[in-house]
Amino acid sequence: MASLALSGSCSLAFPLKSRSLSLPRPPSSSLNLTKPLRSLDSRFSLLKSPLPVSLRRRSSTLVKASSTVASASSSPTPPLVPAPVPWQGAAIKPLLASIATGLILWFVPVPEGVTRNAWQLLAIFLATIVGIITQPLPLGAVALMGLGASVLTKTLTFAAAFSAFGDPIPWLIALAFFFARGFIKTGLGNRVAYQFVRLFGSSSLGLGYSLVFSEALLAPAIPSVSARAGGIFLPLVKSLCVACGSNVGDGTEHRLGSWLMLTCFQTSVISSSMFLTAMAANPLSANLAFNTIKQTIGWTDWAKAAIVPGLVSLIVVPFLLYLIYPPTVKSSPDAPKLAQEKLDKMGPMSKNELIMAATLFLTVGLWIFGAKLGVDAVTAAILGLSVLLVTGVVTWKECLAESVAWDTLTWFAALIAMAGYLNKYGLIEWFSQTVVKFVGGLGLSWQLSFGILVLLYFYTHYFFASGAAHIGAMFTAFLSVSTALGTPPYFAALVLAFLSNLMGGLTHYGIGSAPIFYGANYVPLAKWWGYGFLISIVNILIWLGVGGAWWKFIGLW
């Protein structure tokens, strides 16, 4: 055996062609070493005898060494190449598109009547919007770069660029996410969600309509769409999605969450338009209307004019989204029974659930009666969060971990600041006057002229991150021109006031509820904008078509 091993190792390590020694096969019988060696075979009998232990060890060592040498010579080990580190920075093409947009507009000659600062800020603002749409970086990072560019170019001072971080609306939105954390953490969200599923959960459409009309019923009592969306309905909708197996990031968003989030958002702008007290900026519209046409828009007048087109929109929009952006789970006849089993398993409310429920009732009560008590919406939300922090229902570390809240606060405040200074620098006033001169010079009937003004007023909202800012900048000018062209003043004022809410559905920053529902991350940005534009057309057709007939019936024109 030693000879076979040795010869094998030699042939492996040193392949000889013509000079290799061929050993004869040993006889099958056992060898007798005492007999004389008479043949050639016997001369090699020593090779067939057992080797001493020391020699066998050396032979084994030689075999291993020769094998190592052979393998090394036949297939050399390649050098270790470190795995390439993936690029962690911005997506290059979207970044270049954003920069190119800003540079092109920056070097376009400034129109007459526009200041250089206003034009530069418009270039930075549009570049930021393109960046927010294409997302070379997260939204907060893009918005922060936009603010940095405005400060670097001396377009805005640092104080002006970051002034909107003192605005209450971005903070109210961030606080809404903290409330949602407590709502879900305590289990109260699941409890309420299971109750909804038990009552309406046999179909996704029924579940959606139950939320839509619940929000509409609360709208006249809570004069902040941000508070309604963030403090009450976002936590509830998120809990419903999770309870139905629709989660962010695991491919189940379309089971229910995508459709439900988009539906609740789009209908929140409809309910905001239906009542004078349903949105914080609605009284501003009424006040500006009185200053312009000297006619008062009362709560009853507003509701009477808006109720019919509003109800039609609340019915049509969820069903339309159900058809074009459907949930994959449409029917679940066993859901009510399963929800009841879950409720039975949960048992009575825990201490933290009771604290969360009491805090929510306190906050909502202050949102409803806060105007009489001198407490605004964001102050009420801070008070509610303070209760949750003191009682340990929510911890500050958990608030810090809500990255979506801080990201939303950053980009929303940045857009509010830039859009606000576009108005302060006179760009919006210049645009309004230009539109007024153009439409007034067309010589059209008041119906056609008003239709053009309505569309321009509506779709310029892409440049605004606040309904109040849009109303303050353009409402008076467009109402004045409309009446000058023959539009009935009271009719024009109400239509512009209604549209001042509906236009918030265009983007993820156009109204207070937009960043809240978008921040849940169930709907991609491109779809959010695409469906926002589509629903805007539907709403305009309903409010000017069905609404126009209703307003004719009640004598507004």
Curated annotation (Swiss-Prot):
UniProt cross-references to InterPro entries, sorted A to Z: CitT-rel, SLC13A/DASS
UniProt KW keywords: Chloroplast, Membrane, Plastid, Plastid inner membrane, Transit peptide, Transmembrane, Transmembrane helix, Transport
Membrane-crossing residue ranges in chain numbering: 90-110, 122-142, 158-178, 229-249, 256-276, 305-325, 355-375, 376-396, 411-431, 438-458, 477-497, 531-551
Transit peptide region: 1-69
Presence of keyword Hydrolase: no
Disulfide bonds: none
A GO biological process held by the record: alpha-ketoglutarate transport
PANTHER family: DICARBOXYLATE TRANSPORTER 2.1, CHLOROPLASTIC (PTHR42826)
Function field: 2-oxoglutarate/malate translocator involved with DIT2-1 in primary ammonia assimilation and in the re-assimilation of ammonia generated by the photorespiratory pathway. Imports 2-oxoglutarate into plastids as precursor for ammonia assimilation. 2-oxoglutarate is converted to glutamate, the end product of ammonia assimilation, which is exported to the cytosol by DIT2-1.
Membership in a protein family: Belongs to the SLC13A/DASS transporter (TC 2.A.47) family. DIT1 subfamily.
Protein name as it appears in the record: Dicarboxylate transporter 1, chloroplastic
Organism, scientific name: Arabidopsis thaliana (Mouse-ear cress)
